[in-house]
Amino acid sequence: MTVTMTLGQLAEALGATLKGPEALQITGLATLQEAGSGQLSFLANKQYRKFLESSQASAVLLKAEDAEGFAGNALIVADPYLAYARISHLFDPKPKAVAGIHPSAVVAEDAQVDTSASIGPFAVIESGARIGADVTIGAHCFIGARCVVGEGGWLAPRVTLYHDVIIGKRVVIQSGAVIGGEGFGFANEKGIWRKIAQIGGVTLGDDVEIGVNTAVDRGALSDTRIGDGVKLDNQIQIAHNVQVGDHTAMAACVGISGSTRIGKHCMIAGGVGMVGHIDVCDNVFVSGMTMVTRSITEPGGYSSGTAMQPLAEWRKSAARIRQLDEMSKRLQQLEKRVDTVTSGGQPTSEG
């Protein structure tokens, strides 16, 4: 499906200053390098400014300072990237769901499904579940007993909600995600692992987004909780009893161990691992592949590990790391000799 809007309509939708003809038709979005006739682009990062003058885009979202001297058509806004985010939904070709329950879906007699909801082929909705207004449940989804899916929720095909999962409004969950699976809880009896029943649930706030193949485990006793506006990328593991504060974002392959609490407005980069039973305060940034082994009590950026370097250099560095203990001992001996000299003693013949 092709969407066509005029430059004037887009300017009105964004509250942007228009530079160019109102009637110019825009049929899609693209990068500065790839845009062609009829497409709108944006300049959000200065490193791409070199592509601005040569871009074939019909118009560009620009800051006022970047629009000065630009000969092409523009929509002038305070934040081009945010403006792009807002209008991207206008050109999204994703098919619209049709209200109703597909004949192949299996819905329990006592489940409540709003008449405006869309239930896809072969979906299963178990006893006591409640599906709110304008919810989309994709093909082959499983909605367990007593689950609640709030108004405007969108579940892609093959999403699994175990029993007693509570989802707020406008939540998006991508394919393969499993919400409410059993937490990893076992007690050791003389070398034998005894399973602990996970009798809590999962609660997701409003406007949460969960990526492909991400798992959010149910709590052992109380619920695992994901706050409002939280964004979880693909292949993330959220263990039982974890608490994630409002508007925190995590990139792919993050692993959060059980009972850890993460504050609001945090950014957790890809591949980060956190041990269990720690607290992370609000407004923390953790760089990629960092291993968080203790609580973080001060806002700011945190990192561990080493950045990429040429292989030969890395091998030399690794070899030096193995020598640190011996080097430390030699340094301590040297410090003792320096102390002897500075305190009035005489250096040895070896010094």
Swiss-Prot record:
Active-site feature positions: H240 (proton acceptor)
GO molecular function per UniProt: N-acyltransferase activity
Family: Belongs to the transferase hexapeptide repeat family. LpxD subfamily.
A GO CC term attached to the entry: membrane
Lineage of the organism: Bacteria, Pseudomonadati, Pseudomonadota, Gammaproteobacteria, Pseudomonadales
Entries under SUPFAM superfamilies matching the protein: Trimeric LpxA-like enzymes
Protein name per its UniProtKB record: UDP-3-O-acylglucosamine N-acyltransferase
Record keywords, A-Z: Acyltransferase, Lipid A biosynthesis, Lipid biosynthesis, Lipid metabolism, Repeat, Transferase
Pfam families named in the record: Hexapep (PF00132), LpxD (PF04613)
Gene3D superfamilies: 1.20.5.170, Hexapeptide repeat proteins, MurE/MurF, N-terminal domain
Top-level lineage group: Bacteria
Gene Ontology process terms (BP): lipid A biosynthetic process
EC number: 2.3.1.191
NCBIfam families, per database record: lipid_A_lpxD (TIGR01853), PRK00892.1 (NF002060)
